Amino acid sequence: MDSAAAAFALDPPAPGPGPPPAPGDCAQARKNFSVSHLLDLEEVAAAGRRAAGPVSGPAEARVGAAREPSGGSSGTEAAPQDGDCPSPGRGTKRKKKQRRNRTTFNSSQLQALERVFERTHYPDAFVREELARRVNLSEARVQVWFQNRRAKFRRNERAMLATRSASLLKSYGQEAAIEQPVAPRPTTMSPDYLSWPASSPYSSVPPYSPGGSSPATPGVNMANSIASLRLKAKEFSLHHSQVPTVN
């Protein structure tokens, strides 16, 4: 115990963890990492805490800190250092590297993924994790595959609808052209016909004028001739009665 106290007096205690990074820097760095990378950082932090082990008292903690070399760092300090926000240049390089990586799926993996896609286009996290274990892929790869597969499905659906609507419009136009009768062309009227004045249906019978200037109809002529004959017969009889007879 005396040797431990002497060692603690000679060696200064190890410096504590530095101040936490600014919230703005952390928010900018989180955009450069995927969900799987953040999960890996949490696993590293948990492993560092398990490696440090439980501490029974403050005295033993001070002794352990005194025994460590000055250039090293304890297991408890490894987690904050790993969790610090990296520089923007490093995050950008890692993001570009992740974009270049392309996963090649074999036939069995594609068959399993397509079978699940037929059941649901939006699998939840549990389904994705279960499927990732079955096909020996990461959950992030499975999620990206489903996103690309949904985009492809929407493109194929839009193309199919466009083709179907175009064929329906084409067939409808052909049927309408066959069933619709040919409209007659409008005939142009001659200038002579247009020069005739408009008249009523009874305009063929000329109106009666007392002056007798208009021609009479056959019935009227017959009646006039009969009346004139009677008048002449009457005049003849009167004239015959007035002439004296010579004995």
Swiss-Prot record:
Keywords from the UniProt entry: Developmental protein, DNA-binding, Homeobox, Nucleus
Disulfide bonds: none
Highest taxon of the lineage: Eukaryota
DNA-binding feature ranges: 98-157
GO biological process, one term: middle ear morphogenesis
UniProt note on tissues of expression: In the embryo, expressed in craniofacial mesenchyme, limb, heart, somites and sclerotomes. Absent from central and peripheral nervous systems, splanchnopleure and ectodermal derivatives.
Annotated family: Belongs to the paired homeobox family.
Protein name: Paired mesoderm homeobox protein 2
